[in-house]
Design a protein with these regions (language model features):
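N-terminal Rossmann-like dinucleotide-binding module
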Residues: 1-46
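Beta-loop-alpha module in the N-terminal Rossmann-like domain of NAD(P)-dependent dehydrogenases
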Residues: 46-97
Length: 97
């Protein structure tokens, strides 16, 4: 089973979350968003129990093998590099600045 972490849970992060839920043999393990503390109702609506405001918790989680980077454009490169160094498979929204 492919275990996924989503970084950034705005509009596009939510779209990817819904898409991943439809794929057999995949599971979203955790979500990170810098505004996570203010999004508890949103996470409850989507059935997300494991969330953080620190993307490093996704990167450093040994259960997660794939990271979806759905954060603002200016954060893509930093997060993608950290995910690659951690040996994660990466799906990154464009562009990468």
């Amino acid at each position: 089973m492919r275990k996924i972490g989503i970084i950034g849970f705005g509009r596009i992060g939510r779209i990817h979350f819904k898409s991943v839920k439809k794929i057999n043999d995949t599971e979203v393990i955790a979500v990170a968003d810098p505004f996570a503390d203010q999004m508890t109702e949103v996470f409850a609506k989507f059935g997300i129990d494991n969330y953080s405001n620190d993307f490093n918790e996704i990167i450093n989680n040994p259960e997660i093998d794939t990271v979806f980077i759905c954060s603002p454009t200016d954060t893509h490169a930093e997060i993608a590099i950290a995910a690659a160094k951690a040996g994660k498979d990466i799906f990154c929204e464009k562009p990468i600045d």
